[in-house]
Design a protein with these regions (language model features):
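Residues in intrinsically disordered, low-complexity segments of regulatory proteins
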Residues: 8-11, 50
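Bacterial N-terminal signal peptides
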Residues: 12-25
Length: 148
């Protein structure tokens, strides 16, 4: 009888860690799927090709990962501010990106220097005091930084 109890106890002692180890990958994958990817783009060039490249990259990431699986912000400042003006050649693409859930913000410091007001800008964009500071904060928050 003692021998049987010892065998049962020994079998349990060996089986328990194996069962627990089998659960670890399930827990890890559940945590991974809850993690949201975060991406911040810098647009500070005056060339529409660069604007379109940033917008293409944002769309491609959403298409690949799923729009709900990634947070994307495009920070526009300096000579790139033309991307967000009412008469921008990229205006329709900016509107499409906003509808797709991409956050697009204009630097108010740049707007002040260029004597632009919010009425000069595309509707539905956001604003930040300083574009460079916004990029820094986003990187500190774990956003991957891209400059097309």
């Amino acid at each position: 009888m003692t021998r049987m109890i010892f065998r049962n106890w020994l079998a349990w002692l060996i089986a328990a860690p194996v069962c627990l180890c089998a659960l670890v990958p399930l827990t890890a994958s559940a945590q991974t799927s809850a993690v949201k990817n975060k991406l911040v783009f810098q647009v500070s060039d005056a060339e529409p090709q660069k604007w379109n490249l940033a917008l293409n990259n944002a769309k491609n990431v959403q298409d690949d990962l799923g729009a709900g699986a990634v947070q994307i912000e495009i920070v526009v400042y300096g000579p790139g501010i033309g991307m967000l003006k009412q008469d921008s050649v990229a205006g329709n693409r900016v509107a499409d990106a906003l509808k797709a859930g991409v956050t697009i913000v204009a630097c108010e410091n740049t707007m002040t220097v260029q004597k632009l007001v919010k009425d000069d800008m595309l509707p539905a964009i956001g604003y930040v005091k300083a574009g460079v500071v916004e990029l820094m904060k986003k990187q500190q928050e774990g956003y991957a930084y891209i400059r097309p």
